[in-house]
Amino acid sequence: FDDDGNWPQWFMFDKFEEIKADESHGDIIVWPLKVVSDYLAMTKDYSILEEELPYSSRENFKQTATKETLLQHIDKQISYIEDNFLEGTYLSCYGDGDWDDTLQPANQSLKKNMASSWTVALTYQTVKLFSEVITEYNEDFSNRSKKIYEGVYHDFHKYMLSDEVIPGFLFMGEGNKPELMIHPKDKKTGIDYRLLPMTRSMISELIDQEEVTKHVEIIDEHLKFPDAVRLMNCPANYAGGVSQIFKRAEQAANLGREVGLAYIHAHIRYVEAMAKIGKPEETWSNLEKISPIGIKQVVSNSSLRQANAYFSSSDGDFKTRYDAQDNFNELKTKERQVKGGWRIYSSGPGIYINQLISNVLGIRKNVDQLTIDPVLPIELDGLSLTYKLNDRLLKITYNLNQSVDEVKINGKLVVISQKQNRYRLEGVSIPLETFYEMTTTEGINDVELFIGEV
């Protein structure tokens, strides 16, 4: 929007452009910045920042006649992020919610005084990447962004990790006295653990190895079910559809999608987190739970479902919310069946394929490097993959748990480098120039990967 730089929660295009929301959840402002940051990291195409673009008019929801450069749009966007931290902190205000639509706040006080731990972690990840990729183009923007993400890091650990467990939310009371929500100490919601902040804190490298280990144990004990990793350890309280804290989570009569807690978008992000920290025993097996093909071989308490469609959720077979409230643990013991939820919904299939290729098989390319960083279980030793990278057809063979990390392209050893994330070495990297010199556009190129234990 032209007045403050915020984005609508949802919007339509072209002749329907006047149809859009006039507010948004607290995380929405972050995603456009993440898109630009990811693009610059991949391409270093800084010319895009000089492209002139209109805004959306707050008055009539149409495009403005006035245009500004993308960098000016980003300037406005970052100002909005700064202006909407909880007072005296670098914690993003919850606003009208976050990714989980069912947890929209039920009253104005919660909207203004809550922060989502997941949104805070996403903001840290995005602003940090933007600071890094913008450095050689605009050092002032880089320094400004650095101050923000360092502040986010400090306040996340000061307020949200004041206890050993990351809360789902933080409510900032008078005198900046934090109250942890969806946390073992939370007596109001009756919910102890929330998945999204834990996995995003790993993906963003916001927490250290000791904290990662602690939260993996929590996920294993409280959030991992036979069919999927769940958003919370139990559903929000249901009392006839009356909202006390959250809207749809406490209103919905149907225990499906996010209300039923096994929302597959979040399960995929769990796979991404396990790849980031190097848990090969978790990556492949949890991807298998998503595919409906032969689902009963992987999830034995699954009911029959269509085999050629992506399902956005795995819903417990409860007839009422009260039944689910009393017997939710039967999903863990497999006494209760699970069924496929909404089909072919939103970006799920794309996120699924991206995690398979980019983070589990580990094939990633940026402006000058090809990285192969598999996080695969040892039973897939010898796996071969036919893959096309630009105009090069490749047969990639994965030799796992080797004593030496090396790569051969068409039988010849390649000089490699290795990058360390906060938790582990990330496979092997090859200069793209070398890759193109050693491969051909005709026929199949053999790429043999020899990789040590993750």
Residue map of PLM features:
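Aromatic-rich carbohydrate-recognition surfaces in CAZymes
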Residues: 1-89, 116-120, 124, 257-283, ...
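Active-site-adjacent structural elements in folded domains
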Residues: 14-19, 95-117, 179-189, 201, ...
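Short, well-ordered loop/turn elements at secondary-structure boundaries
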Residues: 26-29, 43-44, 113, 188, ...
